[in-house]
Regions:
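A conserved mid-domain beta-alpha-beta active-site/ligand-binding segment of alpha/beta enzyme cores
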Residues: 134-137
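Conserved RNase H-like, two-metal-ion catalytic cores of nucleic-acid enzymes
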Residues: 1-72
């Protein structure tokens, strides 16, 4: 049986100094603190336990190391916009912390499926109620 991991990350913003609010081009020299991954939530499909790793509880390296271990066990990874956002962000931060490259992952990005439906919006706040899934249903 395949091991399928459902995953989501939350990120923090880039902090910068700049001189206005309209039409700003922020240079690298203006960045005070680079944004990064704040936390990772993951659950094995069919499993009962959720895994939660955070910068404040595990530190950046601990969070990434634990996430790397889960992803390395997975036959496939499921997420929402994960192919364009979550997985590349994780790969980049893992390189930053000298973790070994992740194995090739079979990625199932649910946003790609939702886009085929031609809905008004692909945002989860719209898709959940439209499909009658989520906390309220």
């Amino acid at each position: 049986m395949s091991k399928i991991l459902v995953i989501d990350i939350e990120t923090k913003p880039i902090l910068s100094y700049h001189w206005g609010l309209f039409n700003q081009n922020i240079s690298l020299e203006q960045i005070k603190e680079d944004g990064g991954i704040l936390c990772v939530g993951a659950k094995w499909l069919g499993g009962k336990n959720c895994h939660f790793f955070s910068e404040w509880e595990h530190g950046q390296e601990g969070m990434l190391t634990a996430t790397h271990a889960l992803l390395s066990e997975a036959d496939a990874v499921v997420g929402y916009n994960s192919t364009s956002f979550d997985i590349p962000r994780l790969r980049g931060r893992m390189v930053e912390h000298s973790l070994p490259p992740l194995p090739n992952l079979t990625e199932i990005d649910l946003l790609k499926t939702v886009r085929k439906l031609g809905l008004t919006s692909g945002k989860l706040a719209y898709v959940g109620p439209f499909l009658k899934i989520g906390r309220r249903y």
